[in-house]
């Protein structure tokens, strides 16, 4: 069909439905009634001769044709919005914006307390939302603006993304403060003689630790596997297990959980923690402000 035959206001509803996946939420975000959103979707379906969205228990899922339209429509909407708001400024003191950051639970433990304390003074009405996404969904989320920044070791975010180094992370051995292993220097032999907690942090670079130890022939006695780091402090304080964790997490856990962080007997590769954002939002004033704040607070 010809573009002149399409009511472009319908694409605003389409674009918001791509993000919200629920008619009620889209109506609220656009300041419309639910019947108005439903009617707009009905008209767009008729114009494009495609269902566009199919109702599921997880919300409105886009059809293949809607998914095909998603990127160009989102890009066009963002370009138009930027053009219309070109002369507007971002004032953190009065803004009520919600910023969405993708990070692991380590990131939440390490970054959030300090960031939220500063935001209480510099941007008291702003909201922070954290998410965890797979590499592919994260790429799309950064591209369409549902995620503002991603923080971590994310080697798949390259083409189309900017990045900036925040800090370096090295690994230590974490255990309870009165653990027998703390009585003498931690050798590789003693390290391997105790049971271990292994954290399988899917979608992050921390799996490289296991890969490296396997490659150099180090075999730990794995007694427990967990999918995230948040439980490690609770587990170690009441067991004789050891855990290999990044120093930034250890710094946050030692005092609250009564733990000791020991130099690791294995020389493990350091990991770089970077901050990523999509090229489309490189000049977005709010994004620029948040990036600079993160850099000022956390860069080594």
Curated annotation (Swiss-Prot):
Gene3D superfamilies: Periplasmic binding protein-like II, Winged helix-like DNA-binding domain superfamily/Winged helix DNA-binding domain. Residues 6-63 form the HTH lysR-type domain. Signal peptide: none annotated. GO terms for molecular function: DNA binding; DNA-binding transcription factor activity. One of its GO terms (biological process) is catabolic process. GO terms for cellular component: cytoplasm. It comes from the Bacteria. Regulates the expression of the naphthalene (nahA-F) and salicylate (nahG-M) metabolism genes. This is HTH-type transcriptional activator NahR. It comes from Pseudomonas putida (Arthrobacter siderocapsulatus).
């Amino acid at each position: 069909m010809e573009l002149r035959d399409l009511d472009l206001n319908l694409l605003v509803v389409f674009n918001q439905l791509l993000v919200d996946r629920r008619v009620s939420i889209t109506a609220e975000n656009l300041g419309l009634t639910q019947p108005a959103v439903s009617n707009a979707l009905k008209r767009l379906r008729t114009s494009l001769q495609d269902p566009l969205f199919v109702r599921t228990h997880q919300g409105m899922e886009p059809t293949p044709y809607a998914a095909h339209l998603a990127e160009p429509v989102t890009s066009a909407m963002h370009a138009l919005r930027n053009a219309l708001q070109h002369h507007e400024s971002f004032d953190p003191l009065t803004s009520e914006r919600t910023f969405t950051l993708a990070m692991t639970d380590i990131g939440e433990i390490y970054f959030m307390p300090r960031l939220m304390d500063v935001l209480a003074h510099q941007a008291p009405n702003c909201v922070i939302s954290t998410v965890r996404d797979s590499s592919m969904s994260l790429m799309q989320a950064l591209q369409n603006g549902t995620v503002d920044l991603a923080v971590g070791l994310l080697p798949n975010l390259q083409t189309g993304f900017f990045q900036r180094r925040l800090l370096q992370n090295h690994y230590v051995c974490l255990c309870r403060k009165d653990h027998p292993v703390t009585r003498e220097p931690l050798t590789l032999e003693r390290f391997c003689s105790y049971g271990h907690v292994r954290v399988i942090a899917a979608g992050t670079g921390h799996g490289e630790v296991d890969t490296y130890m396997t490659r150099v022939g180090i075999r730990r006695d794995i007694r427990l596997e967990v999918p995230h780091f948040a439980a490690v402090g609770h587990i170690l304080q009441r067991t004789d297990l050891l855990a290999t964790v990044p120093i930034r997490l250890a710094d946050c856990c030692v005092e609250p959980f009564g733990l000791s962080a020991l130099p690791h007997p294995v020389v493990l590769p350091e990991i770089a923690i970077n901050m990523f954002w999509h090229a489309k939002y490189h000049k977005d004033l709010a994004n620029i402000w948040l990036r600079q704040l993160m850099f000022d607070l956390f860069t080594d």
